Design a protein with these regions (language model features):
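Short loop/turn motifs that connect adjacent beta-strands in outer-membrane beta-barrel proteins
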Residues: 52-56, 99-105, 149-155, 194, ...
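Transmembrane beta-strands of outer-membrane beta-barrel pores
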Residues: 7-11, 63-67, 112-116, 162-168, ...
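Hydrophobic, lipid-facing positions within transmembrane beta-strands of outer-membrane proteins
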Residues: 1, 39-45, 88-94, 110, ...
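Membrane-embedded beta-barrel scaffold of Gram-negative outer-membrane proteins
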Residues: 103-119, 233, 240-243, 269-322
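Signature of Gram-negative outer-membrane beta-barrel scaffolds
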Residues: 155-235, 244
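Outer-membrane beta-barrel translocator domains and adjoining extracellular loop/strand segments
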Residues: 13-21, 64, 69-78, 118-127, ...
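Flexible loop and strand-edge segments within Gram-negative outer membrane beta-barrel domains
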Residues: 10-16, 20-23, 29-42, 48-106, ...
Length: 322
């Protein structure tokens, strides 16, 4: 069993020089940044158990909360700033693993996650004289995987993950999205004295529904991965490695549905990743018993990259594809 916690508080009032003009001799003053306070609290607890050498389980609980000011830029010598953000997050997750034999291994895990965020701007020029939004999100997650060792140097695995994500807010006509995700991966690995090869295929099925308005749509995708490591010299620990990965990332609920921030027209971010590398290990002498050198080159081709860009309010950004 393990338990730990952490609390942090900072006023963030760091000093800066405010200049009243750009010409030499213009007045200046020493100021302190305002509305930069941060308070955070985190607590974790874990339980770990072994039913036998081949059967284990784990349980973890987590809680986090924060309160932070959102400072604005000093514009025309006005440093007034009152916007604030509160966050809370908690989850419980468990994992179970059992080796039925040298050939078969089963593993499953489950998780429940809850998060809350509140944003306040008491200086908004509207009929309420403020902007105040609260968002609530939940996730239910379940996964299972099985590993089969066909030979001592050849193994296959099949894993599947399912999750349900929901979001709500105290806003009129909020869309209230629900996302159903199902991911299934089939993988294989072969190892001998001079070659290691791994390959997998990931099938992703995403269905997204909303109670009001428009959703970000449904998605179907099959993405491959392959990697290899080659040892050309029997007596030297020198290896040549490479991998190729085709993957995509969906926009989060925050990216899609947050007030003033979200953009339901966001496309998934797609990436093709390439890597080639060299690794050399050597036992040199008693003074230098172990030497390792690694060099890698990466190439990523990203399309429809999801980025955040500032709006007229520096504390509120918006999302788009690049």
């Amino acid at each position: 069993m393990s338990v730990n916690g952490e609390w942090m508080s900072s006023d963030g009032h760091y000093p800066y020089t405010l200049r009243y003009g750009s010409a030499e001799g213009d007045l200046s003053s020493r100021e302190k940044r305002k509305n930069t306070d941060v308070q955070t609290f985190r607590a974790e607890a874990g339980l770990y158990g072994n039913f036998s050498d081949k059967e284990q389980w784990r349980l973890k609980a987590y809680y986090f909360q924060s309160s932070r000011g959102l400072p604005k830029a000093t514009t025309f010598y006005n440093d007034h700033s009152t916007q604030h953000l509160w966050d809370k997050n908690t989850f419980i997750q468990s994992q179970y693993k059992k080796e039925f034999s040298q050939q078969w291994v089963f593993q499953t895990s489950a998780k429940w996650n809850w998060s809350y965020q509140r944003y306040l701007d008491p200086d908004t020029k509207n009929s309420l004289k403020k902007t105040e939004n609260s968002y609530y999100q939940q996730e239910y997650y379940l996964s299972a995987s099985v590993l089969y060792r066909l030979l001592s140097n050849l193994s296959f695995s099949l894993s599947t993950d399912g999750s349900i994500n929901t979001m709500n807010a105290d806003l009129n006509n909020f869309v209230q999205p629900t996302r159903y995700s199902w991911l299934t991966a089939f993988a294989g690995k072969y190892v001998n004295d001079w070659l290691t090869i791994s390959a997998s295929a990931l099938a992703t099925i995403i269905n997204e529904d909303v109670k009001k308005g428009g959703s970000a749509g449904n998605h179907r995708k099959l993405t491959p991965y392959v990697s290899a490591a080659f040892k050309p010299f029997h007596n030297e620990e020198f290896r040549v490695r490479f991998f190729y990965k085709d993957i995509f990332r969906l926009a989060s609920f925050n990216d899609l549905y947050y007030e003033e921030v979200g953009n339901t027209q966001l496309k998934p971010e797609k990436a093709k990743q390439y890597n080639i590398g060299l690794t050399y290990n050597k036992n040199v002498c008693s003074f230098l018993p172990y030497l390792s050198a690694t060099i890698d080159a990466y190439y990523n081709k990203v399309t429809d990259k999801i980025i955040a860009y500032p709006t007229k309010n520096l504390a509120v950004w918006s999302m788009k594809n690049l």
